[in-house]
UniProtKB/Swiss-Prot annotation:
Full protein name: Small ribosomal subunit protein uS9
One of the record's GO cellular component terms: cytosolic small ribosomal subunit
Presence of the UniProt keyword Ribonucleoprotein in the record: yes
InterPro entries in alphabetical order: Ribosomal_Su5_D2-typ_SF (IPR020568), Ribosomal_uS9 (IPR000754), Ribosomal_uS9_bac/plastid (IPR023035), Ribosomal_uS9_CS (IPR020574), Ribsml_uS5_D2-typ_fold_subgr (IPR014721)
Gene: rpsI
A Pfam family this chain is assigned to: Ribosomal_S9
PROSITE patterns reported in the protein's UniProt record: RIBOSOMAL_S9
Any one GO molecular function term: RNA binding
Domain of life according to the entry: Bacteria
Family label: Belongs to the universal ribosomal protein uS9 family.
UniProt keyword annotation of Transport present: no
HAMAP family (alphabetical): Ribosomal_uS9_B
NCBIfam families: PRK00132.1 (NF001099)
Organism name: Mycoplasmoides gallisepticum (strain R(low / passage 15 / clone 2)) (Mycoplasma gallisepticum)
PANTHER family: RIBOSOMAL PROTEIN S9, SMALL RIBOSOMAL SUBUNIT PROTEIN US9M
């Protein structure tokens, strides 16, 4: 008998996460490492697990994630969206519950590019009147 897997793709800033949900005991593996070893901050892990806690499926599924690009916050946001989308693929009735907590919407904010003649995206050289 084949193991049923549900997939979800999440993106945030410059990070991309491919999430695979399989029936299991609640293990979370990120790039072949435990979540606690991969992320140094516990708050980031709690934020990432939010879709599972909202739907009360934290101990039902094992989660395997392949994530690349960006920093810890962007990767955690991408994983969070990927988990939410995988849960919706598994059970479309969960979408309403996840949408109330704003977990199925992609955060489209990205870093604004630096413009020529400026020091950053908006920081201009100091203006001298005389």
């Amino acid at each position: 008998m084949a193991v049923v897997t549900f997939k979800g793709l999440g993106r945030r800033k410059s990070s991309t996460a491919l999430v695979k949900l399989t029936p299991g005991s609640g293990k979370l593996v990120i790039n072949n490492r435990k979540a606690e070893d991969y992320f140094p901050n516990k708050i980031v892990i709690q934020d990432m697990r939010q879709p599972l806690e909202v739907t009360k499926t934290a101990s039902i599924y094992d989660i395997n994630v392949v994530v690349n690009g960006g920093g810890f916050t962007g990767q955690a946001g991408a994983i969070r969206l990927g988990i939410a989308r995988a849960l919706v693929n598994m059970n479309p009735e969960l979408k309403k519950q996840l949408k109330q907590h704003k977990l199925v919407t992609r955060d489209a904010r990205v870093k604004e590019r630096k413009k020529f003649g400026l020091y950053g995206a908006r920081r201009a050289p100091q203006f001298t009147k005389r």
